[in-house]
């Protein structure tokens, strides 16, 4: 599978995971919507100076593939508003605790995201990767930042990350070149692997959010 195939499986799964999250914590439907409305109406900065946008807020969904996934995001939303009683308010300021938690949960490891989609680039490609996650996201309007209930996104790399996150900005020129390239080295030899005589076993989660088990 290539990166596009992977995301065409995982974006629908993320919509399903978001639905499960809201079913477990119905109060967070309103909270997440209120946070997104605030982020769309005015500029909000994280403690490190990075802008907190709706797209970055949606990336909290990366937790949905682990434990305690739903609980961790619920705890973050529980402290979102300065009034402190957990109620949603588009007129309230977002709390320092919330902003710090979102920053920690969505801050990128600098070498992880630049390589993320290229693990699927095994040798010469017929077409460039060209920001696979962003392209597939465009096929799913339900992930737009102004859609309610707000859908969260999973483990996916988007071009805005290399503009908004200071740790990733130095990689942007290289990413712009690589995303249009089709010439990559061979990561693995499929023919040699097919001839392997050493018994191997692998396990995968049935409903893995990151790489669909059907692939």
Locations of the language-model features?
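A catalytic-pocket lid/entrance helix-loop region that shapes and gates access to the active site
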Residues: 2-40
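A short, acidic, amphipathic alpha-helical segment used as a generic capping/interface helix at domain edges
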Residues: 181-192
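Short, flexible loop/turn elements at secondary-structure junctions
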Residues: 65, 204-206
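A structural signal for short secondary-structure junctions
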Residues: 192-197, 211-212
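Conserved alpha/beta-hydrolase "acid-adjacent" motif
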Residues: 69-72, 209-214
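Conserved catalytic-core segments centered on acid/base and nucleophilic motifs
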Residues: 1, 200-201, 209-210
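Short beta-strand/loop motif that positions the catalytic acidic residue
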Residues: 196, 201-204
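Alpha/beta-hydrolase fold active-site neighborhood
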Residues: 43-181
């Amino acid at each position: 599978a290539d990166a596009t195939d992977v995301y065409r499986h995982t974006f629908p799964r993320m919509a399903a995971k978001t639905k499960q999250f809201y079913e477990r914590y119905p109060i967070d439907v309103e909270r997440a919507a209120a946070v997104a409305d605030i982020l769309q109406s005015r500029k909000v900065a994280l403690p490190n100076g990075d802008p907190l946008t709706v797209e970055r807020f949606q990336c909290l969904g990366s937790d949905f593939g682990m434990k305690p996934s739903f609980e961790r995001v619920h705890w973050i939303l529980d402290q979102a508003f300065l009034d402190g009683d957990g109620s949603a308010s588009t007129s309230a300021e977002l709390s320092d605790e919330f902003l710090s938690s979102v920053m920690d949960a969505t801050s990128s490891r600098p070498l992880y995201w630049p390589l993320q989609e290229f693990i699927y680039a095994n040798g010469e490609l017929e077409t460039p990767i060209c920001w696979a996650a962003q392209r597939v996201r465009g096929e799913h309007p339900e992930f737009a930042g102004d859609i309610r209930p707000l859908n969260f996104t999973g483990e996916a790399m988007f071009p805005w990350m290399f503009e908004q996150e200071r740790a990733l900005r130095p990689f942007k020129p290289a990413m712009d070149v690589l995303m249009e390239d089709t010439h990559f080295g061979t990561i693995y030899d499929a023919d040699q692997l097919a001839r392997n005589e050493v018994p191997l076993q692998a396990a995968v989660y049935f409903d893995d959010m990151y790489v669909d088990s059907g692939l």
